[in-house]
Curated annotation (Swiss-Prot):
Listed name of the protein: Cysteine--tRNA ligase
Cofactor note: Binds 1 zinc ion per subunit.
Gene3D superfamilies, per database record: Cysteine-tRNA ligase, C-terminal anti-codon recognition domain, HUPs
A GO molecular-function descriptor: zinc ion binding
PANTHER family: CYSTEINE--TRNA LIGASE, CYTOPLASMIC, CYSTEINYL-TRNA SYNTHETASE
Keywords in alphabetical order: Aminoacyl-tRNA synthetase, ATP-binding, Cytoplasm, Ligase, Metal-binding, Nucleotide-binding, Protein biosynthesis, Zinc
Extent of motif 'KMSKS' region: 253-257
Family listed: Belongs to the class-I aminoacyl-tRNA synthetase family.
The keyword Ligase belongs to this UniProt entry's keyword annotation: yes
One Pfam family, short name: DALR_2
Amino acid sequence: MIVDSVSQKPTTLVQKTINIYLCGPTVYNDLHLGNTRPLIVFDVLNRVLKKAKYTVNFVQNITDIDDKIIKIAQQQEVSESVVTKQQITAYKSLLKKLNILPIKHIQITEKIDKIPDYIDQLVNQNHAYVSTQNNVYFAVNSLKQYGYLANRMVHLEETDTDKKNKLDFVLWKITTAGIKWNSKWGLGRPGWHVECAFLIDYCFKNELTIHGGGVDLKFPHHENENALHMALYNQPITKHWMHIGHLMIENQKMSKSLQNFLLAVDFLNFHDFRVLRWIFYQKHYLHPIDLNQSLIEKANNDIQRIAKTLNVARTWLVYSEQSELISPKQYDPVFSALLDNLNFANAVAAIWKLIKKINTSIKTKDFSVLREQLSFLEWSIDLLGISFKSIHTKLNVRLIKEWSILHKQKAMDKADQIRKKLIKKMLL
């Protein structure tokens, strides 16, 4: 079940094929931490849907032509493709570092030659017009549903540009700067809003299940995408909307324009990727998160606590000779929480309750119960994308078994020497 962020209504996903479109980056520089929140939230959604036996088609655009890209290319005296190729490589590397499951990426430049025909349909239906300077604009007053997403009324406002209405937005921009494409209106480039609307139409037609992005995209970007689709098909561009809350610093949205951002790659140079993911699980995805040092430290401590629980539990199962073929097992309290509109609070609470039970089983040496509890924990953290690689190497397992034998033989001095080694290795 998800709650539509526009209608505010809960919806059960009935169809077994789920089509997702998440607005992607404009690749002119590196992502800041705020940009990663939608990626991580939608990655969990993707994991949950797949575990629930849905077929998921997950598409994300990469905007690889834009005024910012052209400006940087000119400053560096290179082509736009040199800039974007470097940034796309960096972006995909970041996705791997964040443990994001594979997404189908489509670069806008790969499909631009098809966009003029899409725009021409809007012109022919009188939803778009060609200006005196041969730019093509969408006429917002041609669509009575315009303003639906943002819940605002649209009034005709005069403008001193070649647009008829201040809110009209560009579909095709005539330009002499940077890379250009041919069209019946002249050399130029498509506008940002029409790029996403076209890609959704190209990939899914009228079958998009969930459209997502940061809450700041709700207006004007998603409003304008939706308007284009409504104009052509007389129905919304997607069945459901998911908007992700801001990442804040000192009560201000983290953004490049405010110069209050921290690059994701810089954060990951000092912190485990699991720390960032865990931070985003501390609030519902709709709500803003205020990033501060205490939150980072708490998340770091939490991740270390989870890792230690896994390591110690595995060690005791080796000790008790019950460590063979432990496979992750579905844990309903975590799964149910995430199926309920990604209720991170309940999922996290369920994990802490499970860890408490694991510690009790270790104390009481109830190893058969511990074995099942560990399989629950491994399944749960995999669902959240924060799994750990086992540190129980052959050498470490041999050391644990040696400790086990000495401990059971009551050779306490020798056993304690090995125990200290195990503690140092984070195995106890």
